[in-house]
Design a protein with these regions (language model features):
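Short, surface-exposed, charged amphipathic helix/loop patches that serve as local interaction elements
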Residues: 2-113
Length: 113
C-alpha cells in the first residue's frame, strides 16, 4: 500500500495516466494482467466518439476509445469484448471520464480517494 505522499507524488508525475486495478484479472499470451494503465485520450482519439456518450457511460463508446487509451498492456477491441469483465470496462471508462474533467475537479476527486 502506498502512503498519501507517494500517491500525490505519483499523480504529480503522471497526471495523464491512471493505473486501474482489475477486479477480474485475465491472461494475454500466458501473462496474467492484473492492472491496466489508462492514459488521457488525445483529441484524435476523441474524434472517434461523441464526448457526451463517454460522459454518459456508453459502453460502445468506451470500448471504441479504450484501445486508443490503454497502455501496459494496450488492449484491442476484441480483447475488451472477450477477456475483460464488464466491471473493469466501467472502471477504465471512469478513468477516461475523470481525464475529461477540469484539473480543479480532478484535484477534488483525488483528495476524496
Amino acid at each position: 500500500m502506498q502512503t498519501q505522499e507517494q500517491i500525490e507524488n505519483l499523480q504529480a508525475i503522471q497526471q495523464d495516466v491512471e493505473i486501474v486495478d482489475l477486479d477480474s484479472p485475465f491472461k494475454i499470451g500466458g501473462q496474467e494482467i492484473k492492472s491496466v494503465e489508462v492514459r488521457k485520450p488525445s483529441v484524435i482519439a476523441l474524434r472517434k466518439v461523441r464526448i457526451a456518450d463517454i460522459l454518459n457511460g456508453d459502453v460502445n463508446s468506451i470500448c471504441t476509445l479504450l484501445p486508443l487509451c490503454t497502455t501496459n498492456p494496450t488492449l484491442t477491441k476484441q480483447q475488451l469484448d472477450t477477456l475483460v469483465d464488464p466491471v473493469d470496462i466501467i472502471q477504465m471508462g471512469s478513468a477516461i471520464i475523470t481525464f475529461l474533467q477540469p484539473k480543479s475537479v480532478r484535484a477534488e476527486i483525488a483528495l476524496q480517494q
